[in-house]
């Protein structure tokens, strides 16, 4: 569908060693033109820009485990779809709720080669603590730990500014799944020459869609949100935050229950 797709590597936040194995989190900005028919419908000729974060485990010069999150919300919006409507249409194209391809859920997970969690660098620990506090509704942490002029890059290709923007994003997500279990699955921190201190976290929310928030009226659907976040730290706290999850996957899980 995207024969001219270009992958522009923005950052790689990594841990480990070639001998023992390496966990790396790659943030990629993709540009493409919708030139072929496929899962996104008939070729439209529209130009797209979206991000991907992929956590990869490699050893012996080979990647043997990967967790990839594409900003599908950004893709479908640029093609003229609403993410919810796209998910509903996709279910029908795949044969209905009983036959469609099921989004990933921990209940169907298979243990892969990598069972570690990253490294114990202080910057990764700090960001993990911040996210855990946010997900515990301790929103006072945001104006304390985020730069007043922070820029946040979020699902759907959205950009939000200031600690107020960060607060709004995380609050709306958590409000949709207030009883869901929050988990830190990968945690990496790094300091490199000519770069700000950075952290990469792969996280998840697993539970019921039982609150009003970013995903509308609560439905009670069982939902798994796989998310990934990168941050850069400055002298006044987090100055850039990049967070991705697949909105269409979440809407698909909701629509499979509601019909």
Range-by-range predicted roles:
Residues 1-259:
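C-terminal and inter-domain tail/linker signature
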